[in-house]
Amino acid sequence: MFVRDHLPRRSHGVARTLPDQRELVAAFGGHPSDTGEDHPLVAWARALAALHRQRHCDPLAAAGIDCRRAELVATIDKWVVEQLLGKRPVDHLRAESLGATVDRMAAAHVHASHLLHTAEKVSDARVHAAWYRLALLADEWTDLITGGVRETVRGRRPA
């Protein structure tokens, strides 16, 4: 999980155009990119994670935060349409909202990180389950950007 060279460099250049799961997970944790240059999607991923952290700390501000998250999801999806869909044969990207996937990954990362830092034992089943869910979403991201189709143990994609 989250290995640097995990993504195959195929799928009509899409894998090279979009950040891989490792870059997104690093962004969710607030880490800078390896190259020092942020891909726009990495910057938006970092912003989504910050909004999820803010939402956790200030539940009364949830409505405004959720509106901003929706704006970022729409921005990501618009960027994908403008930058990728018109230029390359990437039909597999049309079926899913990449912005919504990044938002779900950001929420899962923030939740897993919170549990890791607040649980009495890091071996707590809830901590493991939260990180496992993030791994499933990271795999979903990889499948979306490479055109793969992966099923979970139960035969369905993670929510």
List each language-model region with its residue ranges.
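Anionic, Ser/Thr-rich low-complexity intrinsically disordered regions
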Residues: M1-A159
